[in-house]
UniProtKB/Swiss-Prot annotation:
Name by which UniProt lists this protein: Sulfate adenylyltransferase
Activity regulation remarks: Allosterically inhibited by 3'-phosphoadenosine 5'-phosphosulfate (PAPS).
GO biological process, any: hydrogen sulfide biosynthetic process
Binding sites annotated in the UniProt record for ATP: Q197, T198, R199, N200, G291, R292, D293, H294, V333
Protein family membership: In the N-terminal section; belongs to the sulfate adenylyltransferase family. In the C-terminal section; belongs to the APS kinase family.
Organism name: Neosartorya fischeri (strain ATCC 1020 / DSM 3700 / CBS 544.65 / FGSC A1164 / JCM 1740 / NRRL 181 / WB 181) (Aspergillus fischerianus)
Pathway(s) the chain acts in: Sulfur metabolism; hydrogen sulfide biosynthesis; sulfite from sulfate: step 1/3
Pfam family, one: ATP-sulfurylase
Length: 574
């Protein structure tokens, strides 16, 4: 018998509302609609299939405040993460959304109607309170950045009626709903199930710790990786799922199953661990492995962890009775070469030789093509990871040149393009500032918002080209730190490599050598919003390379860039 769902009843809204499907579909076409973002889609899917039981919709203000302040819903049920539907001021100003009215929730990918929400209330969240109580308050936390920069001004709360499932085109057979997974466990005769959450590839150590956890509890294993939204920079879920599938035969026959979870993670540490436990309980698991720094976002700019290493374990243990799922504390295991086995570190006698490979070292080995030993990971898993992580010398990169107009950016960009073409090995694309303005951003002006949009477009193109293995050279003015950081994030999140080169040629030199007289026009007031004259240039705080045309030749600067790329391994050394 699978574990009872959180709150006692599995809120499978898709099954509940199926008899009214046609009626709801017709009504949905007559209602105003909210087109959901990717994160909202992930949340809606788990509301509709019961993964977020006992929720039946997006939280109203009463539930939102209670979850933030008390880690439970207004009715007293334990729940740790605000699940909210945010909308913009413009949507509110439109006047179509009011308490008591109904609104269609629509998929941005295919314009399908997914659900109808009956609005309970519309409220402006206290984002500072949410940031502090839910995520700890550090403004460098990715969830807090998302909250302040991406989440809209208002939340709409209310219960939903489900119309259609989300369409998925990848690994459909592995995307079990809670009800389907419970039926699967029952068919297999599983009564005790240890769930393992991961957003990373699994290696031999993970296999050992999950098998140990299952044996100690006479249980089976649910490998339940997140394939929704995870941490930027994580290995893509297509690669990870292939690796999980390759690993599965390494378990004793009949011990483990693989199921995928379309969750949008918040990287919320202790709060997220409680949330993950609730989700796994709803999927029928009786035990849940909580690791060291579970769902933590890593370190801030000062090198400090956002949470203590065992905060998540302590949080789940605190609510153990209410959760109704047994916490299995993640045991760090290490490899003993003399006996060819893995053991928990606290069980290894003093003086016994051990071996470990850190995540950083693994990434370096994948990047450089260095061998990865079989004691660490299985050959079939390594093969899959290598296919998705080609050697550095075959990867693409973006060189992003920033500086004043007439600082020498374009001359450097053109010379670098020629040099890289001569080098060979990858295609080279040039995105000059004026060219992009003419071809991609001709309708934009030079307000801060329009400048940011222009850089976003450059970054999107650069990210797509870089991901495909090209070398991209971009040379916009890009005067704002926020825009440059967003460009770096866009390229790296697309799977590319990004180098910011600050062309720090002094403004006086740029003006003095301006043969087109553009600075003179700006000084006379004929051009408004001109960088360096009546609009600021924010000096980059994290440039990978700083150069100056007033002190260096273009040739020497290009050579510096080439040396930087060579040092990073972007040219074949064989």
């Amino acid at each position: 018998m699978a574990n009872p769902p959180h709150g006692g009843v599995l809120k499978d809204l898709l099954a509940r509302d199926a008899p009214r499907h046609d009626e709801l579909e017709i009504e949905a076409e007559q209602l105003p609609a909210i087109v959901l973002t990717e994160r909202q889609l992930c949340d809606l899917e788990l509301i509709m299939n019961g993964g977020f039981s006992p929720l039946e919709g997006f939280m109203n203000q009463k539930d939102y405040d209670s979850v933030c302040e008390n880690v439970r819903l207004a009715d007293g049920n334990l729940f740790s993460m605000p699940i909210t539907l945010d909308v913009s001021q413009a949507v509110i100003d439109d006047g179509k959304l009011k308490p008591g009215s109904r609104v269609t929730l629509r998929d941005f990918r295919d314009d399908r109607n997914l659900a109808i929400l009956t609005i309970d209330d519309i409220y402006r969240p206290d984002k500072a309170k949410e940031a502090k109580l839910v995520f700890g308050g550090d403004e460098e936390h990715p969830a807090i950045k998302y909250l302040y920069n991406k989440v809209q001004e208002f939340y709409v709360g209310g219960k939903i009626e489900a119309i259609n499932k989300l369409n998925h085109y990848d690994y459909v057979a592995l995307r079990y709903t809670p009800a389907e997974l419970r039926v699967h466990f029952d068919k297999l005769g599983w009564n005790r199930v240890v769930a393992f959450q991961t957003r990373n590839p699994m290696h031999r150590a993970h296999r050992e710790l999950t098998v140990r956890a299952a044996r100690a509890r006479q249980a089976n294993v649910l490998i339940h990786p997140v394939v929704g939204l995870t941490k930027p920079g994580d290995i893509d879920h297509f690669t990870r799922v292939r690796a999980y599938q390759a690993l599965l035969p390494r378990y004793p026959n009949g011990m483990a199953v693989l199921g995928l979870l379309g969750l949008a993670m918040r990287m919320g540490g202790p709060r997220e661990a409680i949330w993950h436990a609730i989700i796994r309980k709803n999927h029928g698991a009786t035990h849940f492995i909580v690791g060291r720094d579970h769902a933590g976002p890593g370190k801030n700019s000062k090198g400090q962890e956002f949470y203590g290493p065992y905060d998540a374990q302590h949080a789940v243990e605190k609510y153990r009775e209410e959760l109704g799922i047994e916490v299995v504390e993640f045991q760090q295991v290490t490899y003993l070469p003399d006996t060819d086995e893995y053991k928990p570190k606290d069980e290894v006698p003093a003086g016994v030789k051990t071996l470990d490979i850190s995540g950083t070292e693994l990434r370096n080995r994948l990047r450089t093509g260095a061998p990865i030993p079989e004691w660490f990971s299985y050959p079939e898993v390594v093969k899959i990871l290598r296919e998705s992580s080609p050697p550095r010398h075959t990867q693409g990169f973006t060189i992003f040149l920033t500086g004043y107009m007439n600082s020498g950016k374009d001359a450097i960009a053109r010379a670098l393009q020629v040099t890289l073409n001569q080098q060979g090995g990858r295609s080279v694309s040039l995105l000059l500032g004026d060219t992009v303005r003419h071809e991609l951003s001709s309708e934009l002006g030079f307000s801060r918002e329009d400048r940011h949009t222009n850089i976003q477009r450059i970054a999107f193109v650069a990210g797509e080209l870089t991901r495909a293995g090209a070398a991209v050279i971009a040379s916009p003015i890009a005067p704002y730190e926020e825009s440059r950081n967003a460009a770096r994030d866009a390229v790296t999140q697309a799977g590319g490599n990004f180098f910011l080169v600050h062309v720090a040629t002094p403004l006086e030199y740029c003006e003095k050598t301006d043969k087109r007289g553009i600075y003179a026009k700006a000084r006379r007031g004929e051009i408004k919003g001109f960088t360096g004259v009546d609009d600021p240039y924010e000096t980059p705080s994290k440039a990978d390379l700083t150069v100056d045309v007033s002190k260096q030749t273009v040739r020497s600067i290009v050579h510096e860039i080439i040396l930087m790329l060579e040092t990073e391994g972007f040219f074949d050394r064989s």
